[in-house]
Amino acid sequence: MSVNVPLHKWRSADPAILIGRRCIAQTDQDVIIDGRLELIRHPDGAASLRFQGIGNDIIAHDPNTCSNSMSAGIRSLAIYGKE
């Protein structure tokens, strides 16, 4: 039996280590999305994480502060370890 433990320090984590992790997000419209994260790098050095196969960004990475934040439209989220 495996137990999923949330990754509490996702706000300061390097976005590359979040690739493939399970994420459960709740949108502002109370829609629950459950899936794996993929990394998208932007030309300006910023990055974002989104669910594999879904085009909406879930997490935005700011390279100036080396921090992550929830993207617009996301109310809450939990990130879990790789299974």
Indicate where each model-derived feature is located.
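Mixed-charge, Lys/Arg-rich low-complexity intrinsically disordered regions
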Residues: 1-17
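Intrinsically disordered, low-complexity, charged/polar segments
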Residues: 2-3, 55-83
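Intrinsic disorder/low-complexity segments
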Residues: 14-17, 26, 48, 61, ...
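Short coil-to-beta-strand transition motifs
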Residues: 26-34, 70-73
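Basic/aromatic-rich interaction segments and small domains that mediate binding to polyanionic partners
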Residues: 31-63
